[in-house]
């Protein structure tokens, strides 16, 4: 009886901590950061645009007039871009603009595998669209997320308010700090993709990833053609400090060569804002200073994007 009582107590404490964790500021901010839908997505007949993408797109798109839906999740691979788009295809009318937003490392990555990175899809997608679906992972991800929280589980006990990154409006730091932030980002990419540098590194070991993602991109093109959607390839803005970390030769080999020919062959509009003058030296447009747009930055970017879509005949109706 004593053992049973202790076991019941442990279970009760676990359930309580899990409940508190799911309702903590940390967990709610995580949900918002991922852009995980907390309720059914509202698809109105006024929707003109749907965007895909990962973290950079998560902070680039905000539809101030409710004329679009963001399917960007943080983080997200091209595989799940397509899974989400196909999953919601019945809600997306013909002539909708579909923006495929390409972060720098997109084509060097096949997929994310850790539960921390894919848990969001267990809330949103049917199991046949989740790679290596597991009922156990579903139970952990949806019912008991405290089990993969690690040290962050402390927020189930100490529920301290944390500001959401989504609401950040500007970044006020020194030039030296901005360069350090850019370097830290690049160090992560070098480690993740096994690159010696970002100027002339050998990328032959990444060819299987490049080929895998090119096939997915062709699938995306075919899907948009079949549905009558207007596909657009977009490269997001980066601050000068970030752009200085790369050579153009490296980016052509590692990045642009994976989609430029597909765009040309299929007559897909390509809009590149990476070197846009507006974003080079106004770090208040990025909440992290270099590549994740702030609230102000989103307004500037969305205005530019919508006007460019209008000029190219993609945006129907009055000029934005």
Go through each PLM region and give its residues.
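Extracytoplasmic/secreted cell-surface and envelope-processing proteins
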Residues: 106-113, 242-244, 280-283
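Histidine-centered active-site loop/cap adjacent to the catalytic His
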Residues: 286-320
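Membrane/wall-proximal cationic-aromatic binding patches
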Residues: 12-88
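N-terminal Sec-pathway targeting helices
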Residues: 1-9
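Substrate-gating cap/lid alpha-helix
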Residues: 240-273
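Membrane-embedded segments
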Residues: 56-137
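Secreted/periplasmic serine-hydrolase-like ester/acetyl group-modifying domain
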Residues: 115-227, 317-320
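Active-site segments of SGNH/GDSL-like serine hydrolases
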Residues: 221-247
């Amino acid at each position: 009886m004593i053992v049973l009582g202790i076991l019941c107590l442990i279970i009760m404490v676990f359930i309580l901590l899990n409940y508190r964790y799911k309702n903590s500021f940390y967990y709610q901010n995580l949900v918002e950061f991922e852009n995980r839908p907390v309720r059914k997505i509202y698809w109105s007949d006024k929707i003109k645009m749907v965007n895909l993408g990962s973290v950079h797109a998560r902070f680039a798109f905000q539809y101030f007039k409710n004329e679009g839906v963001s399917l960007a999740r943080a983080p997200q691979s091209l595989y799940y871009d397509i899974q989400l788009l196909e999953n919601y295809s019945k809600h997306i009318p013909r002539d909708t603009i579909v923006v495929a937003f390409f972060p720098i490392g997109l084509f060097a990555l096949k997929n994310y595998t850790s539960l921390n990175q894919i848990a969001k899809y267990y809330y949103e997608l049917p199991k046949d669209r989740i790679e290596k679906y597991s009922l156990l992972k579903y139970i952990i991800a949806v019912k008991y997320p405290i089990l993969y929280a690690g040290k962050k589980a402390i927020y189930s006990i100490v529920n301290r308010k944390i500001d959401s990154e989504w609401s950040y409006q500007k970044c006020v730091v020194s030039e030296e700090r901005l360069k350090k932030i850019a370097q830290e980002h690049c160090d992560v990419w070098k480690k993740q993709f096994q690159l010696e540098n970002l100027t002339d590194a050998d990328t032959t070991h990444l060819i299987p990833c490049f080929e895998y993602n090119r096939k997915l991109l062709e699938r995306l093109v075919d899907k948009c053609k079949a549905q009558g959607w207007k596909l657009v390839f977009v490269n997001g803005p980066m601050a000068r400090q970030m752009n200085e970390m790369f050579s153009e030769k490296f980016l052509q080999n590692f990045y642009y060569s994976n989609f430029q020919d597909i765009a040309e062959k299929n007559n897909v509009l390509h809009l590149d804002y990476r070197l846009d003058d507006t974003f080079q030296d106004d770090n208040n447009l990025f909440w992290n200073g270099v590549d994740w747009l702030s609230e102000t930055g989103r307004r500037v970017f969305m205005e530019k994007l919508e006007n460019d879509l209008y000029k190219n005949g993609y945006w129907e109706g009055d000029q934005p």
